[in-house]
């Protein structure tokens, strides 16, 4: 396991049962895990702190987004896939209890209309 993955897993274990979130940043040629505050009111979702994102961006090149699924499998949800597309970055997802990982890359994913939650004006 790479050092950044070990650091991300430690973060996820510390924040469980809330989702942890962070970034993978290349600083001076090395990948580093950048812890970010999860601003979501709901522990089953994550919202990266814009201040943490800006600090990471100043420190180096952001190459990926990380978050944990402490209550479910390390499998990308539709929301994860849409977020990955919007960010244009690889996403890593980890279940800290099981120690399992997955990653997804932007690939043109569009959420299906059937089964999508309806919201006025969206």
Q: Language-model features: where?
A:
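Cys-dependent condensing catalytic cores that perform Claisen condensation/acyl-transfer
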Residues: 65
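Conserved beta-strand-loop surface patch within small alpha/beta domains used
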Residues: 1-62, 71-122
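Extracytoplasmic ligand/sensor domains, especially the bilobed periplasmic-binding protein
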Residues: 68
